[in-house]
Amino acid sequence: KAKNLLASMMVGSEFNINEGILKTNSYTIRVKPRFVNRDQDIAFDYTGNTIQSTGREEWKEEFDINREILDPLNAQIKIRINLISGLNKFSINLLEIESGKVEKNFYEVTGKDIYTFNETDYECIILKRIRKTDDRETIYYIAPDLNFMFLKIVDTGKDRNQTLELIEILSFG
């Protein structure tokens, strides 16, 4: 959840994990700039073998129920599961929320680096994501000492560059 004076944003994913396999049920985005509502809801229908989006992006696509398809939020959970399991190279079928198409994303551990968070140095796994259909590259800094938490994500492409960094670790007791 993120807020500022002009907008608030909430992203949610409802899913199940069974023996390391994620099954997405729904993905929700709530973006509320003061002047426009840009919500989007995505629902997986396992009986009808369809994924449907309503709201900002409207589409409906058929899918193979035997294929693990992940949304952008639970893909991070799957990355952690794979790294904890010792995988250094893997792929994830990622749902493109704008179109409903499913794109295979390839991941590979490329090394280690020290990342400083809250004045503490953490040895991080450097994980590189490759998307073969576009000119984007994403580098993840993941700290095994923090239960494989994402500390920094750098996404570079021809149209935009983004860096996300962890600001605070919350404790729920």
Where are these regions (language model features)?
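Acidic, serine/threonine-rich low-complexity disordered tracts
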Residues: 1-43, 86-173
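Hydrophobic, well-structured mid-protein blocks that either form specific transmembrane helices
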Residues: 36-82
